[in-house]
Amino acid sequence: MGSLQTPTNLSNKSCLCVSGRVVKGLRVERQVGLGFSWLLKGRRNRKVQSLCVTSSVSDGSSIAENKNVSEGLLLGAERDGSGSVVGFQLIPHSVAGDATMVESHDIVANDRDDLSEDTEEMEETPIKLTFNIIFVTAEAAPYSKTGGLGDVCGSLPMALAARGHRVMVVSPRYLNGGPSDEKYANAVDLDVRATVHCFGDAQEVAFYHEYRAGVDWVFVDHSSYCRPGTPYGDIYGAFGDNQFRFTLLSHAACEAPLVLPLGGFTYGEKCLFLANDWHAALVPLLLAAKYRPYGVYKDARSIVAIHNIAHQGVEPAVTYNNLGLPPQWYGAVEWIFPTWARAHALDTGETVNVLKGAIAVADRILTVSQGYSWEITTPEGGYGLHELLSSRQSVLNGITNGIDVNDWNPSTDEHIASHYSINDLSGKVQCKTDLQKELGLPIRPDCPLIGFIGRLDYQKGVDIILSAIPELMQNDVQVVMLGSGEKQYEDWMRHTENLFKDKFRAWVGFNVPVSHRITAGCDILLMPSRFEPCGLNQLYAMRYGTIPIVHSTGGLRDTVKDFNPYAQEGIGEGTGWTFSPLTSEKLLDTLKLAIGTYTEHKSSWEGLMRRGMGRDYSWENAAIQYEQVFTWAFIDPPYVR
């Protein structure tokens, strides 16, 4: 391995991270996006102090030494001995420095020749590719979470790190003055500052770091992330400066691999950026428009991951100048609304759409299920981007999200009344009767108990359940619904509980332990979503032996296999029921099939339970599929060079 050179403007202090731990003191200043003439002015032939870390090939040990080098300035980036970039700015350059790098590579080559002689007769073993992966995300559990995005970016990085990859997650450091601030208690200030030029001003950001579960969790610190509310808004709605907040995140994330000496080494230039949803969609654009023209990140790749295409980061066209992109790149993000969607006759419909830009320039595109990857190429599911996505279908893939199999495990779950497993289902009955008792329902182990867990809104199909309840209540069943959302649905749930006191229970709000108990105690889980990119509740349900009934859409269609009692020589196959079209009549028909199977065919029902519990929806399984897409990304040259 060649020598690794840290940024040239280091002080004599030190702040290297060793095995994820930080020694405080070093301050590294980075100027991002400065003009050529500004950086040249008054900085020619200066003396700089640099720290070289030369790695030993044989044992991985490192030797650090200080060198005073008289260097001229060239446009580009400072590079370490292996050719990786250390900070994007005008860099010192010297013939002597280049010669040193060549010599170090020659030494490595000689060492390799010696090693090859000693190992000629050794059997060749397959080499597993490993990657430097940078997740860029608006949320990552347990630090920040509002939905599935937080789950993915909190769990998938750890699964990839466990498989040998070097993984960094870059997200904002949200502080709202409440108990949630404690989640960042172990994050240490790296004392590294980057100056980002966007929105017509220079913004300084800091970086905090925690090394946990093999992952470098990096948090971008700025005053715009310090306010009450969620990552996106408060009780009054979405924050008006979200475009600014996530533009800042994207710029900072692009600098992080170059300037943060995590574990003593920067991630360097050859890495893979995984930009999640519109909040991070500017990253592929910055790589293509701002960095690669100057030879920086020429070996990097970018993947945009679409968790919900309904959210695209659309803003007025006049805000383009705020993004920090060159003027000639406007066409990449230009988005014009159709005439019928404009506010008035003089409205040109012209906007900027950063997700559109990411789809246009990223090396590959991912969604959170195979079904959703197809749906977003249709006019019904693409939200205006279907034609662009169809044009890039050759690099579009879907990978089903995993679940935390430790947190969601019926044999160890601390929230449920009795533990059970695929080999011993007896504890599930105890979970059911305990749930009935907790909710104040008649304790009836043989009565089908139907559950719903989710947001109370149109997308989740709550109106379909509302229409079906009067007829469903005529059957011998019990129903429990947990969720919050639109007031009309919350009021309807309370009213329905008063009408059917022995059959219906409403829990308005959200409670994690209760969601576990409903998942374990119910026999059937309803998910009549209009669209569902992936969905997690159906995966939790199957792991707990609860049978999902879902609308045939997106990830629901991918993960729930229809029950066929006649397959496998009468043993049956499938893990639940899907239905389409999305109507209350079709939902009721499917429920009647399920209830009939539950009451009259116990062995078939037990088979459904065991097959669902036996499915592998772990993050490790998902990580293997992500590795394949990463490999494909590096087979081809960058899509935009």
From Swiss-Prot:
Its main location: plastid. GO terms for biological process: starch biosynthetic process. Pathway: Glycan biosynthesis; starch biosynthesis. Induction: Constant expression in light and darkness. Keywords: Amyloplast, Chloroplast, Glycosyltransferase, Plastid, Starch biosynthesis, Transferase, Transit peptide. Gene3D superfamilies: Glycogen Phosphorylase B. GO terms for cellular component: amyloplast; chloroplast. The keyword Transit peptide applies. InterPro entries: Glyco_trans_1 (IPR001296), GS/SS (IPR011835), Starch_synth_cat_dom (IPR013534). It catalyses: [(1->4)-alpha-D-glucosyl](n) + ADP-alpha-D-glucose = [(1->4)-alpha-D-glucosyl](n+1) + ADP + H(+). Pfam families: Glyco_transf_5 (PF08323), Glycos_transf_1 (PF00534). GO terms for molecular function: alpha-1,4-glucan glucosyltransferase (ADP-glucose donor) activity; alpha-1,4-glucan glucosyltransferase (UDP-glucose donor) activity. It is found in: Plastid, Chloroplast; Plastid, Amyloplast. Its EC number is 2.4.1.21. It is an enzyme of class 2 (transferase). PANTHER family: ALPHA AMYLASE DOMAIN-CONTAINING PROTEIN, GRANULE-BOUND STARCH SYNTHASE 1, CHLOROPLASTIC/AMYLOPLASTIC. Plays a minor role in starch synthesis in storage organs (tubers), but may contribute to the deposition of transient starch in chloroplasts of leaves. Belongs to the glycosyltransferase 1 family. Bacterial/plant glycogen synthase subfamily. This is Soluble starch synthase 1, chloroplastic/amyloplastic. It comes from Solanum tuberosum (Potato).
